[in-house]
Swiss-Prot record:
Family label: Belongs to the xanthine dehydrogenase family.
Name of this protein: Xanthine dehydrogenase/oxidase
Cofactor field: FAD; Mo-molybdopterin; [2Fe-2S] cluster
EC number in record: 1.17.1.4, 1.17.3.2
Catalytic class of the enzyme: oxidoreductase
Binding site for substrate: E801, R879, F913, T1009
Length: 1331
């Protein structure tokens, strides 16, 4: 049968595709067929929003043009017939005019690495197309489906709030009495100049937006016909009528129905499922009908329309009729981002039959009715406990389809609630969901009907029938509560090895949810003055019934203005926007995978181990060779040079004979396209002989599996210190690992040049020189034949310092073997599986202290999980030991470090580099000292704090010790003591919600601890027109390094920044570079740039003297005509660096950065949920080179630390397989995760004489300040435990990091947790283990 032509529009241009493949996504088509690379691939599963576009179509059923955001990575092109697509390139450009959305995110400093920026721009643009004057709440809701790993979200929201009708930010101008900077503080604030000026923004003019394609509008009355698209493996049929759909299902009952592709797309990509025939019913009318018993929705109705319809119903119907609707709306509020809700259908959510569905428990509890049809039959069934007979199964026969669902009106005396608990509120998969309904006999509190339905408690949605049936005719009181809780605890049990783990937490949630429902109904009954044997609501319990509400935003950014008289062209100290921000916002900025494909380019896909430790018995590529476009398979046998690689020469480019982790690279397939490469890699068959594996730190300790050497720092007399101590506390702390989650995954393009072994590499790496060295070693050629080029990265955070070479060595080998350009960009799941992350740590400590709280002795044994190679683990452990004191002077101290060798992918550098782990351990035992002494934690911390001139435990003298200033300023500006009293009062008045405060300092050493890395070079070219091309050894990954280097050169040369340009970092301009890491890149590269500029200035000096009134261009031209070189190099090495572990002497650091943060949180003791109310930060960055960039780094680091300490959790199976391989299972902070009040102040008048222009490093030091959130949570848990008779140990308790909802809930011991204690059966393997 002949395939139809696919017709759609992209940015106003008509696209006719004669060979539409149903497996091709819109993202792939945009990037590879149309060359529109602004839309990014971040995850491939609709979880990050980097691929967001706007889709527009004429909706025949609503009789209007509709605009909605969508994930291009999930949208099949076949679903876009007669749809208009708008990408970031279609709304504005630096070459013409930026759209106001693009301009505002750029000028408000909302783009750092920029990889997420186009998607965020398109989410905001879509909102404005639908609502030109949105509310602040609508703006925040628009970004539920978008992630950013760099900015900390504040500048994005603050910039876009200028569009809001109810809260445009004045930018801190001080002209608005209601300014967020003037709210909720009595502390005197010296207003800074604003980071941006909203008055400079181009106004939004909705009349100037592109029109909907007239050709598509003319088709609105044309009858639709069935369409058929044929791909390599899949046929797509677009049904135009219900009868067509029924006939198609009758002909092929196994044909898969697809609407939004939000579930099927995931199954095809990540579960390797194939559906040869896909039928799309999206054109079939999806009527919304208001009937006598409820509102009926067609099964294809998008969830966004369901949400809008129910919101209208709640606003217009009597309150007693809308109880169920409110429950559905509460679930939809957190269901997913706009991109998913706009395309996902209500019927698809039901038929998917997910055991953790947000909506199915609600529909089941409400008694929703489903209309099911097939050819010649039609039936209506109630969605009850029988509808899901097994895992992912429904009662529908293969030939049947779901036609509609009717959500009922609630009745008088009927109450309904819906609940969900996940790791993160926005766009997260639930741990447990629930729908609960009760109907009372008229005028009484006697139960007539009770439905308690749950997701996440079985392999399907379940109804607690045994429990609920026993409550009929009982009264709504304390006795019923106890009976239901006891019944649920027995009926909804989970095996210790249940998939998803968190068994006690999930079981407890079933009771907690019912208790919330009980209180909510009790409250409503009380309002109605029903006293018929009804329980009474304790006022301290009332807050447990409140739904989550985020407080209005209040953000402050304070910094020191440049001195009066500073030249206007001197941009040092000014909040200059990131130089590439506008290009990033318009999609014009080029990242590695954005480079256009070469004519004969090939694609590579890695083949990795599925065993943690095993011998390789055989590799069979025969099936892979059958995949269309297959070229070759490469392995260790193809390496012409050395297969040995890695920082410690303990790795292999490709595993040979044996694998040592799941994800170990065995080989790679090379094909003509990315899709074919993926299929071919999956077809490679490897057989193994398993060997014993070591997965966890505890395993490694038990089996003495360590890398050498054991590290130790010791000072004072530990024996004497402990003997003199009044108290001694011992314990341990576990700190989980963290995934980098840079939005741009690892990417390499290798281009063989055809001469003398030359190879040109485009790589997303922080380490150009090591990449060059490793590739040269692998190919067996000198380093001078390998050119490595880096334009920019979409984030790095340490993850691209060494681990980028796992891709950048495989790709050039394929290019060498084939003689053709080869490209590889890892999928998100590959990247997370292969490249490692932050090291998990286990610390065992013993601390001795006096009754006054003064610590006199400390012993800490540190263990890190390094994985299967050493990589940078030794340096990371060294830094952990250097930071084991944090900010405290401990006279007698010993720290040891053991690096565990395990069968996990090698862990590596991550922002902070071991420092955060060392400091969190310090603050943990410090908090236990305070609790034991019965003293305020802030008093104990201050009492033990270093003073100016003190020596650290590694004998480095503290000079320029600004920490006390930071501490006092933070105490004052945060109103710590007053707010602590307010929190105590809140806790007295609320039983199930508790607040906590904490103030935490940080001291972070600045330098590579490997001395020779503290060097940098720069190259400056001055052209005859006066323009300057600047190159240095650092790479740009969003931290603003290139921007700061231009500012440094601008001041040094005394010319405007507009005359200076940085193109890229490359090994043929600046050789032998150090990695862009350790927060020192501005220090060392800035000084090298300065030195190069000074050389240029000295050469120009004679011409300036001859022509003092001349211009820069005049002097440059004169020098050129006099044959004076206008090119200069600069070089810098940090002086007086070097430390000996043997003698505990020398200086590992050039200087220290300091900061203090105070945070307040509120926890829900029943669910473990928490919200970050407020954070105040005071940070010493010296004399800031760029306050906007520095504040952005402070906020971004803090929010990344917030993820580390409260949210991000890696789950491994006992066999060493990573469960969390994407944004659906691994949660980083989202827009709603940040503190409602976020106040950052850069310490004034604190120049640093040891760095360029008196500045200080800023990238890593602020991250640890997020520990203030962790300890604020712990403070709130203490308040919960103190008031609960079920808790035996009130204040000393174990809280490992991260403080997830599971850990928070389990720590808030109460009558519900007591009912849900689950033993561990020896025969059961847990779903996940703590590595």
């Amino acid at each position: 049968m002949t395939a139809d032509e696919l017709v759609f529009f992209v940015n106003g241009k008509k696209v006719v595709e004669k060979n539409a493949d149903p497996e091709t996504t819109l993202l792939a088509y945009l990037r590879r067929k149309l060359g529109l690379s602004g839309t990014k691939l971040g995850c491939g599963e609709g979880g990050c929003g980097a691929c967001t576009v706007m889709l527009s179509k004429y909706d025949r059923f609503q009789n209007k043009i509709v605009h909605f955001s969508a994930n291009a990575c999930l949208a099949p092109i076949c679903s876009l017939h007669h749809v208009a697509v708008t990408t970031v390139e279609g709304i504005g450009s630096t070459k013409s005019r930026l759209h106001p959305v693009q301009e505002r995110i750029a000028k408000s400093h909302g783009s750092q690495c920029g990889f997420c920026t186009p998607g965020i721009v398109m989410s905001m643009y879509t909102l404005l197309r639908n609502q030109p004057e949105p509310t602040i709440e609508e703006i925040e809701d628009a970004f539920q489906g978008n992630l950013c790993r760099c900015t900390g979200y504040r500048p994005i929201l603050q910039g876009f709030r200028t569009f809001a009708r109810d809260g445009g930010c004045c930018g801190g101008s001080g002209n608005d009495l209601n300014c967020c900077m003037n709210q909720k503080t009595d502390h005197k604030i010296t207003l800074s100049p604003s980071l941006f000026n909203p008055e400079e923004f181009t106004p939004l003019d909705p009349t100037q937006e592109p029109i909907f394609p007239p050709e598509l509008l003319r088709l609105k009355d044309t009858p639709q016909k069935q369409l058929r698209f044929e791909g390599e493996r899949v046929t797509w049929i677009q049904a135009s009528t219900l009868q067509e759909l029924l006939d198609l299902k009758a002909q092929d009952p196994e044909a898969k129905l697809v609407v939004g592709n939000t579930e099927i797309g995931i199954e095809m990509k990540f579960k390797n499922m194939l559906f040869p025939k896909m039928v799309c019913p999206a054109w079939i009318p999806e009527p919304v009908e208001h009937g006598p018993e409820g509102i009926s929705f067609g099964a294809s109705c998008p969830l966004s329309l369901v949400e809008k319809t129910l919101l209208d119903a709640v606003a217009n119907l009597p309150a007693h009729q809308t109880e169920v609707f409110k429950g559905v709306l509460e679930q939809l509020r957190w269901f997913a981002g706009k991109q998913v809700k706009s395309v996902a259908s209500i019927g698809g959510n039901i038929i998917t039959a997910s055991p953790i569905s947000d909506l199915n428990p609600v529909f089941m509890a409400s008694g929703a009715k489903l209309t099911i049809v097939s050819t010649g039959t039609r039936r209506t069934v109630r969605m009850d406990h029988t509808f899901f007979p097994a895992y992912r199964k429904t009662l529908l026969a293969p030939e049947e389809i779901l036609l509609s669902i009717e959500i009922p009106y609630s009745r008088e005396g009927e109450y309904f609630s819906a609940f969900k608990q996940a790791s993160r509120r926005e766009d997260d998969i639930a741990k447990v969901t629930s729908g609960m309904r009760v109907l009372f006999n008229p005028g009484t509190a006697q139960v007539k009907e009770l439905a308690l339905c749950y997701g996440g408690m079985h392999d399907r949605t379940v109804s607690a029938l045994q429990t609920t049936r026993k409550q009929i005719s009982n009264f709504w009181n304390e006795e019923l509560l106890q009976n239901v809780c006891a019944g649920l605890a027995e009926e909804l049990s989970l095996a210790p090895d249940a998939p998803g783990g968190m068994v006690e937490f999930r079981r407890t949630l079933t009771l907690s949810f019912f208790f919330k429902f009980y209180l909510t109904v009790l409250q409503k009954l009380g309002i109605q003055n029903s006293k018929d044997k009804c329980g009474k609501l304790d006022p301290t319990h009332a807050s447990a019934t409140l739904l989550f509400q985020k407080d209005p935003p209040a953000n402050v950014q304070l910094f020191q203005e440049v001195p009066k008289g500073q030249c206007e062209e001197d941009m040092v100290g000014r909040p200059l926007p990131h130089l590439a921000a506008a290009m990033q916002a318009s999609g014009e900025a080029v990242y590695c995978d954005d480079i256009p494909r070469y004519e004969n380019e090939l694609s590579l896909r890695l083949v990795t181990s599925t065993r943690a430790h095993a011998k390789i018995k055989s590799i069979d590529t025969s099936e892979a060779q059958k995949v269309p476009g297959f070229v070759c398979f490469i392995s260790a046998d193809d390496v012409p040079g050395s297969n040995i690689t890695g920082i410690g020469n303990d790795e292999m480019v490709f595993a040979k004979d044996k694998v040592t982790c799941i994800g170990h690279i065995i080989g790679a397939v090379v094909t003509d396209t990315r899709e074919h490469a993926q299929r071919a890699a999956q077809a490679v068959r490897i057989t193994y002989e398993d060997l014993p594996a070591i997965i966890t730190i505890e395993d490694a300790i038990a089996k003495d599996s360590f890398y050498e050497p054991e590290l130790k720092i010791e000072k004072g007399n530990l024996t004497k210190g402990f003997s003199e101590a009044d108290n001694i506390v011992s314990g341990e702390l576990y700190i989980g690992g963290q995934e980098h989650f840079y939005l741009e995954t690892h990417c390499t393009i290798a281009v063989p040049k055809g001469e003398a072994g030359e190879m040109e590499l485009f790589v997303s790496t922080q380490n150009t020189t090591k990449t060059q060295s490793f590739v040269a070693n692998m190919l067996g050629v000198p380093a001078n034949r390998i050119l490595v080029r880096v334009k920019r990265m979409g984030g790095g955070f340490g993850g691209k310092e060494t681990r980028s070479t796992v891709v950048s060595t495989a790709v050039p080998l394929a290019a060498y073997k084939t003689g053709r350009p080869v490209r590889c960009m890892l999928d998100r799941d590959e990247d997370m599986l292969i490249t490692g992350g932050r090291h998990p740590f286990l610390a065992r400590y013993k601390v001795g202290f006096m009754k006054t709280g003064r610590v006199v002795a400390l012993k800490v044994e540190h263990y890190s999980n390094a994985g299967n190679t050493l990589d940078l683990s030794q340096s990371i452990m060294e830094r952990a030991l250097f930071h084991m004191d944090n900010c405290y002077n401990i006279p007698n101290i010993r720290g040891t470090g053991r690096i565990c060798k395990t069968n996990l992918p090698s862990n590596t550098a991550f922002r902070g580099f071991g420092g955060p782990q060392g400091m969190l351990i310090a603050e943990h035992w410090m908090s236990e000292v305070a609790v034991t002494c019965g003293l305020p934690a802030e008093e104990v911390r201050r009492k033990n704090m270093y003073k100016e001139g003190d020596l650290t435990h590694f004998n480095q003298k503290l000079e320029g010790f600004t920490l006390p200033r930071c501490w006092e300023e933070c105490l004052a500006s945060s109103q710590y003591h007053a707010r602590k009293r307010e929190a105590d009062k809140f806790n007295e008045e609320n039983c199930w919600k508790k607040r906590g405060l904490s103030i935490i300092p940080t001291k972070f050493g600045i330098s590579f601890t490997v001395p020779f890395l503290n060097q940098a070079g720069a190259l400056v070219h001055v052209y005859t027109d006066g323009s300057v091309l600047l190159t240095h050894g650092g790479t740009e990954m969003g931290q603003g390094l290139h921007t700061k280097m231009v500012q440094v050169a601008s001041r040094a040369l005394k010319i405007p920044t507009s005359k200076i340009y940085i193109s890229e970092t490359s090994t043929n301009t600046v050789p032998n570079t150090s990695p862009t890491a350790a927060s020192v890149s501005t220090d060392i590269n800035g000084q090298a740039v300065y030195e190069a500029c000074q050389t240029i200035l000295k050469r120009l000096e004679p011409f300036k003297k001859k022509n003092p009134s001349g211009s820069w261009e005049d002097w440059v031209t004169a020098a050129y005509l006099d044959a004076v070189s206008l090119s200069a190099t600069g070089f810098y090495k940090t002086p007086n660096i070097g430390y000996s572990f043997e003698t505990n002497s020398g200086n590992p650091f050039h200087y220290f950065s300091y900061g203090v943060a105070c945070s307040e949180v509120e926890i829900d003791c029943l669910t473990g949920d928490h919200k970050n109310l407020r954070t105040d930060i005071v940070m010493d960055v010296g004399s800031s080179l760029n306050p906007a960039i520095d504040i952005g780094q402070v906020e971004g680091a803090f929010v990344q630390g917030l993820g580390l300490f409260t949210l991000e959790e890696l789950h491994y199976s006992p066999e060493g397989s990573l469960h969390t391989r994407g944004p659906s299972t691994y949660k980083i902070p989202a827009f709603g995760s940040i503190p409602s009040e976020f106040r950052v102040s850069l310490l004034r008048d604190c120049p640093n004489k040891k760095a360029i222009y008196a500045s200080k490093a800023v990238g890593e030091p602020p991250l640890f300040l997020a520990a203030s959130i962790f300890f604020a949570i712990k403070d709130a848990i203490c308040a919960a435990r103190a008031g609960n008779p079920d808790c035996k140990t009130k204040k000393l308790f174990q809280l490992n990091s991260p403080a997830t909802p599971e850990k928070i809930r389990n720590a808030c011991v109460d009558q519900f947790t007591r009912l849900c204690v689950t033993g561990t059966a020896e025969s059961c393997k847990p779903w996940s283990v703590r590595v």
